[in-house]
């Protein structure tokens, strides 16, 4: 394989600011007159993964494709870069955790699990971050919106699919504290991503 293809792929992933699918990488390379089939691109990605093995960076495959990111072991070093505006509130974390595990879910169902009212600002914030979307409306009086997570949420959480989330304890009644606690490992990824975006 042409070593330059590997370097081109690395440049694209570094500069993109978002995950790139294999087909996107191939299309961009072709637009620049660089011939590479999907097999060559996969080899290039594997080589990058090996090259970053001893680095603070890693190549990660998430729901929307491939991206370069900081390894978990180094995300704590970024805390000094976080401003108060970029911090995720406990109530926001509880709400997104409930949506992730119970989706599709209504605002009323979230409030029932949390035991407190969900602020309109939290829902708006999650919609603005593109972490949730409305997937439809429940066939009950008032037809409340059904909320689900998005690919952006999966990308920011560094997972490919929602089933990659840690399993919840097996019992009928699960509190918001247990749900949020289960996803605490991923909280660092969400905060690190917020730093990168702002």
PLM ranges: what are they?
Residues 20-28, 104-113:
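Short acidic, hydrophobic short linear motifs in intrinsically disordered regions
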Residues 63-75, 137-159:
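Short, cationic-aromatic polyanion-contact patches
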Residues 188-197:
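Conserved small/polar residues in nucleotide/adenosyl-binding loops
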Residues 49-59, 130-138:
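A short, conserved structural fragment
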Residues 13-14, 18, 85-105, 109:
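Short amphipathic alpha-helical interface segments
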Residues 36-44, 116-128:
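Short amphipathic alpha-helical interaction segments
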Residues 77-87, 153-172:
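Short, amphipathic alpha-helical interaction segments positioned at domain boundaries
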Residues 1-8, 69-93:
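Short alpha-helical segments that sit at the start of domains
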């Amino acid at each position: 394989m042409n070593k330059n293809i590997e370097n081109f792929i690395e440049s694209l992933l570094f500069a993109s600011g978002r995950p790139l699918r294999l087909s996107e990488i191939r299309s961009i390379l072709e637009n620049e007159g660089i011939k590479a089939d999907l097999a060559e691109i996969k080899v290039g990605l594997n080589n990058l993964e090996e090259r970053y093995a001893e680095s603070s960076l890693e190549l990660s495959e998430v729901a929307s494709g491939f991206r370069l990111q900081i390894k978990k072991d180094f995300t704590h070093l970024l805390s000094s870069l976080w401003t108060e505006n970029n911090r995720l509130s406990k109530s926001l974390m509880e709400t997104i955790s409930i949506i992730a595990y119970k989706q599709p879910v209504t605002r009323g169902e979230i409030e029932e699990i949390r035991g407190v009212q969900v602020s309109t600002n939290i829902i708006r914030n999650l919609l603005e971050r593109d972490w949730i979307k409305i997937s439809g409306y429940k066939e009950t009086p008032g037809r409340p919106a059904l909320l689900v997570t998005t690919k952006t949420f999966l990308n920011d959480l560094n997972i490919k699919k929602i089933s990659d989330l840690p399993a919840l304890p097996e019992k009928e009644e699960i509190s918001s504290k247990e749900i949020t606690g289960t996803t605490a490992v991923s909280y660092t990824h969400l905060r690190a991503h917020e730093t990168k975006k702002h």
